[in-house]
Amino acid sequence: IADLKNRIETIQKFKSGNNSSSLINIISRYTKLANKGNLGKNIYACKDKINIKLFEKKSEIDVFRFLQSLENLVNTNNWEYSQLINSFEENIQVLIEIFDNENGVMVMTEDLNLRKNRLNLLAIVRNYSLLIADFTLLNF
């Protein structure tokens, strides 16, 4: 029960902040696209799921580095939901950039290897966000 209370308090505090609508929107976009892939919602490690050799743009590398930082965070003892949500807030531009017309990538590309790799990248972001809440269900 303490864990649930902690999550609720973190979400309430987050929703009262300035960036909440932007972050909810971008994580919802990640989630909707990630759901088109087949990576399970219980996968948090990039190893064997993401092939960095397939990255074509810096935006993919940046999201990958963000995931590495999240992995390091949740692998520490006593990490808190507030730390996780703060990391998402601090990296909102990284999350947005992957969809940018010039600097981003086409996730649903015809190349199936690239598509799977990109969907897995988005899915792992989704999975970390689900540790806090399903952002597609958060209302303003």
Give the residues covered by each predicted segment.
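Amphipathic alpha-helical "coupling" segments that flank catalytic cores
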Residues: I1-F140
